[in-house]
Amino acid sequence: MSDDASTLLRTISWFTEPPSVLPEHIGDWLMETSSMTQRLEKYCAQLRVTLCREGFITPQMLGEERDQLPADERYWLREVVLYGDDRPWLFGRTIVPQQTLEGSGAALTKIGNQPLGRYLFEQKSLTRDYIHTGCCEGLWARRSRLCLSGHPLLLTELFLPESPVYYTPGDEGWQVI
């Protein structure tokens, strides 16, 4: 699944402004400015992270993501799947320039199976430069350039088919939008 999701991310057309065709319920999820981890936790008894890939990569391995970050010799890559009650909900890809990892940013390489949002949203120095939204094959995604103490990282989140982003509460339980 992680390879498929990672490949799919590379084919997404990104919008700098939310498109007019974006359903309101989905747009609310995509434009979430707080922790996506905390929002997802409201919809399940257990949120679990499976680490798919982690380690340093070269600038040549970034593709168009390179345009979203400052030039550096290497970047820390972390790819995960978040599961809500054992259902795959979100594929996350984080790219961190080596310079961001200096000082307190080094903790980003030691998160392991913990949700990134738990760490990031505890940091008082966290800011968000933007949220871009995108869609591919009926799946919605968002990417944000976040900064810790002024140093950037790129977080991309692909909402998988079983994610609550595609459901809305109805009279008879959750219904597909």
From Swiss-Prot:
Residues bound to substrate are 36, 78, 116, 157
Q: Which GO terms describe its cellular component?
A: cytosol
Query: Could you say which enzyme class this protein belongs to?
Result: lyase
* Similarity field: Belongs to the UbiC family.
HAMAP family given in the database record: UbiC
Q: What's the protein called, per UniProt?
A: Chorismate pyruvate-lyase
Listed under subunit, the entry gives: Monomer.
| Cellular localization per UniProt | Cytoplasm
What species does this protein belong to? Pectobacterium atrosepticum (strain SCRI 1043 / ATCC BAA-672) (Erwinia carotovora subsp. atroseptica)
According to the UniProt entry, what is the EC number of this protein? 4.1.3.40
Q: Which GO terms describe its molecular function?
A: chorismate lyase activity
Name its GO BP terms in alphabetical order. Answer: pyruvate biosynthetic process; ubiquinone biosynthetic process
Just give the chief location class.
cytoplasm
- Give the protein's function: Removes the pyruvyl group from chorismate, with concomitant aromatization of the ring, to provide 4-hydroxybenzoate (4HB) for the ubiquinone pathway.
Q: Which cystines does this chain contain?
A: none
One Pfam family from the UniProt entry?
Answer: Chor_lyase
Q: Which UniProt keywords apply?
A: Cytoplasm, Lyase, Pyruvate, Ubiquinone biosynthesis
- NCBIfam families in UniProt: PRK11655.1
Q: In which pathway does it act?
A: Cofactor biosynthesis; ubiquinone biosynthesis
* SUPFAM superfamilies recorded: Chorismate lyase-like
